[in-house]
Protein backbone atom coordinates (compact mmCIF):
# COMPACT_ATOMS: atom_id res chain seq x y z
CA UNK A 1 0.00 0.00 0.00
CA UNK A 2 2.86 2.35 0.79
CA UNK A 3 4.21 1.65 -2.70
CA UNK A 4 0.86 2.57 -4.26
CA UNK A 5 0.79 5.79 -2.26
CA UNK A 6 4.37 6.63 -3.27
CA UNK A 7 3.41 6.06 -6.92
CA UNK A 8 0.60 8.57 -6.54
CA UNK A 9 -2.38 6.21 -6.74
CA UNK A 10 -5.56 8.25 -6.62
CA UNK A 11 -7.67 5.34 -5.35
CA UNK A 12 -6.79 2.20 -3.39
CA UNK A 13 -9.46 -0.51 -3.34
CA UNK A 14 -9.13 -2.98 -0.45
CA UNK A 15 -12.55 -4.45 0.41
CA UNK A 16 -13.62 -6.11 3.63
CA UNK A 17 -14.61 -9.75 3.08
CA UNK A 18 -16.43 -11.35 6.00
CA UNK A 19 -16.71 -14.55 3.97
CA UNK A 20 -14.04 -16.04 1.73
CA UNK A 21 -14.85 -17.93 -1.46
CA UNK A 22 -16.83 -21.00 -0.45
CA UNK A 23 -14.62 -23.93 -1.46
CA UNK A 24 -16.98 -26.43 0.22
CA UNK A 25 -14.06 -27.57 2.40
CA UNK A 26 -15.48 -26.73 5.81
CA UNK A 27 -18.64 -26.25 7.82
CA UNK A 28 -18.56 -22.55 7.10
CA UNK A 29 -16.44 -20.16 5.09
CA UNK A 30 -15.84 -17.23 7.39
CA UNK A 31 -12.69 -15.35 6.59
CA UNK A 32 -10.06 -15.03 9.30
CA UNK A 33 -11.07 -11.84 11.18
CA UNK A 34 -7.70 -10.23 10.55
CA UNK A 35 -7.88 -10.93 6.82
CA UNK A 36 -11.55 -9.99 6.63
CA UNK A 37 -11.08 -6.56 8.14
CA UNK A 38 -7.39 -5.78 7.56
CA UNK A 39 -8.41 -2.73 5.55
CA UNK A 40 -10.17 -1.33 8.64
CA UNK A 41 -6.92 -1.73 10.56
CA UNK A 42 -4.96 0.00 7.79
CA UNK A 43 -7.46 2.86 7.60
CA UNK A 44 -7.18 3.44 11.35
CA UNK A 45 -3.39 3.18 11.56
CA UNK A 46 -1.85 4.51 8.35
CA UNK A 47 -1.94 8.29 8.21
CA UNK A 48 -0.38 8.12 4.73
CA UNK A 49 -3.67 6.73 3.39
CA UNK A 50 -5.02 10.27 3.51
CA UNK A 51 -2.97 10.89 0.33
CA UNK A 52 -5.29 8.57 -1.64
CA UNK A 53 -8.96 7.74 -1.55
CA UNK A 54 -8.95 4.45 0.37
CA UNK A 55 -11.99 2.38 -0.57
CA UNK A 56 -12.90 -0.53 1.67
CA UNK A 57 -16.51 -1.59 1.13
CA UNK A 58 -17.93 -4.76 2.66
CA UNK A 59 -18.47 -7.24 -0.17
CA UNK A 60 -20.03 -10.70 -0.42
CA UNK A 61 -17.95 -12.46 -3.07
CA UNK A 62 -20.09 -15.62 -2.98
CA UNK A 63 -23.01 -14.11 -4.86
CA UNK A 64 -21.80 -12.44 -8.05
CA UNK A 65 -25.17 -10.86 -8.79
CA UNK A 66 -25.40 -9.21 -5.37
CA UNK A 67 -21.71 -8.35 -5.50
CA UNK A 68 -22.23 -6.49 -8.78
CA UNK A 69 -25.22 -4.57 -7.42
CA UNK A 70 -23.35 -3.68 -4.22
CA UNK A 71 -20.27 -2.54 -6.11
CA UNK A 72 -22.44 -0.47 -8.45
CA UNK A 73 -23.99 1.38 -5.50
CA UNK A 74 -20.62 1.82 -3.79
CA UNK A 75 -18.82 3.04 -6.91
CA UNK A 76 -21.65 5.40 -7.83
CA UNK A 77 -21.43 6.96 -4.36
CA UNK A 78 -17.63 7.06 -4.04
CA UNK A 79 -15.94 7.08 -7.43
CA UNK A 80 -18.29 7.67 -10.34
CA UNK A 81 -20.88 5.90 -12.42
CA UNK A 82 -20.08 2.59 -14.11
CA UNK A 83 -22.57 0.54 -16.12
CA UNK A 84 -23.74 -2.55 -14.23
CA UNK A 85 -22.89 -4.64 -17.30
CA UNK A 86 -19.23 -3.51 -17.09
CA UNK A 87 -19.09 -4.33 -13.39
CA UNK A 88 -20.50 -7.81 -14.02
CA UNK A 89 -17.99 -8.38 -16.82
CA UNK A 90 -15.14 -7.23 -14.57
CA UNK A 91 -16.30 -9.60 -11.81
CA UNK A 92 -16.46 -12.53 -14.25
CA UNK A 93 -12.99 -11.73 -15.59
CA UNK A 94 -11.66 -11.41 -12.07
CA UNK A 95 -12.99 -14.83 -11.08
CA UNK A 96 -11.62 -16.35 -14.30
CA UNK A 97 -8.18 -14.95 -13.49
CA UNK A 98 -8.48 -16.19 -9.91
CA UNK A 99 -9.24 -19.71 -11.19
CA UNK A 100 -6.23 -19.59 -13.54
CA UNK A 101 -4.03 -18.35 -10.70
CA UNK A 102 -5.23 -21.08 -8.34
CA UNK A 103 -4.67 -23.75 -11.02
CA UNK A 104 -1.07 -22.51 -11.26
CA UNK A 105 -0.66 -22.58 -7.48
CA UNK A 106 -1.95 -26.16 -7.35
CA UNK A 107 0.31 -27.24 -10.24
CA UNK A 108 3.32 -25.71 -8.47
CA UNK A 109 2.37 -27.49 -5.24
CA UNK A 110 2.23 -30.81 -7.06
CA UNK A 111 5.57 -30.07 -8.74
CA UNK A 112 7.16 -29.25 -5.37
CA UNK A 113 5.83 -32.46 -3.78
CA UNK A 114 7.13 -34.53 -6.70
CA UNK A 115 10.55 -32.87 -6.45
CA UNK A 116 10.72 -33.46 -2.69
CA UNK A 117 9.75 -37.12 -3.00
CA UNK A 118 12.14 -37.79 -5.88
CA UNK A 119 15.01 -36.15 -4.01
CA UNK A 120 14.36 -37.43 -0.49
CA UNK A 121 13.59 -33.95 0.85
CA UNK A 122 11.40 -33.19 3.83
CA UNK A 123 8.22 -31.26 3.16
CA UNK A 124 6.87 -28.42 5.28
CA UNK A 125 3.38 -27.03 4.82
CA UNK A 126 3.27 -23.36 5.75
CA UNK A 127 -0.28 -22.61 6.77
CA UNK A 128 -0.56 -18.86 6.95
CA UNK A 129 -2.62 -15.86 6.10
CA UNK A 130 -2.24 -13.37 3.24
CA UNK A 131 -0.91 -10.65 5.52
CA UNK A 132 2.06 -12.86 6.42
CA UNK A 133 3.68 -11.86 3.12
CA UNK A 134 3.73 -8.24 4.30
CA UNK A 135 7.46 -7.49 4.77
CA UNK A 136 6.61 -5.32 7.77
CA UNK A 137 5.27 -8.30 9.73
CA UNK A 138 6.75 -11.34 7.97
CA UNK A 139 9.04 -13.53 10.01
CA UNK A 140 10.98 -15.28 7.23
CA UNK A 141 9.85 -18.73 8.33
CA UNK A 142 9.77 -19.85 4.69
CA UNK A 143 13.41 -18.87 4.19
CA UNK A 144 14.43 -20.55 7.43
CA UNK A 145 12.66 -23.78 6.44
CA UNK A 146 14.32 -23.78 3.01
CA UNK A 147 17.73 -23.14 4.59
CA UNK A 148 17.17 -26.26 6.71
CA UNK A 149 16.54 -28.36 3.60
CA UNK A 150 12.75 -28.42 3.57
CA UNK A 151 10.68 -28.06 0.44
CA UNK A 152 8.00 -25.64 1.56
CA UNK A 153 4.50 -25.56 0.17
CA UNK A 154 1.47 -23.49 1.06
CA UNK A 155 -1.77 -25.06 2.18
CA UNK A 156 -3.47 -23.62 -0.92
CA UNK A 157 -1.02 -25.43 -3.18
CA UNK A 158 -1.87 -28.92 -1.91
CA UNK A 159 -5.29 -28.82 -0.21
CA UNK A 160 -6.95 -30.17 -3.36
CA UNK A 161 -5.04 -33.43 -2.82
CA UNK A 162 -6.87 -34.26 0.43
CA UNK A 163 -10.48 -34.96 1.30
CA UNK A 164 -12.13 -32.56 3.76
CA UNK A 165 -11.98 -33.83 7.34
CA UNK A 166 -15.24 -33.87 9.22
CA UNK A 167 -14.64 -33.39 12.92
CA UNK A 168 -16.79 -32.94 16.03
CA UNK A 169 -16.16 -29.20 16.21
CA UNK A 170 -17.48 -26.38 14.06
CA UNK A 171 -14.80 -25.55 11.51
CA UNK A 172 -15.42 -21.84 11.04
CA UNK A 173 -12.61 -20.95 8.68
CA UNK A 174 -11.50 -22.51 5.42
Role assignments for model-derived ranges:
Residues 1-174:
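An N-terminal assembly and electron-transfer interface module characteristic of large anaerobic redox
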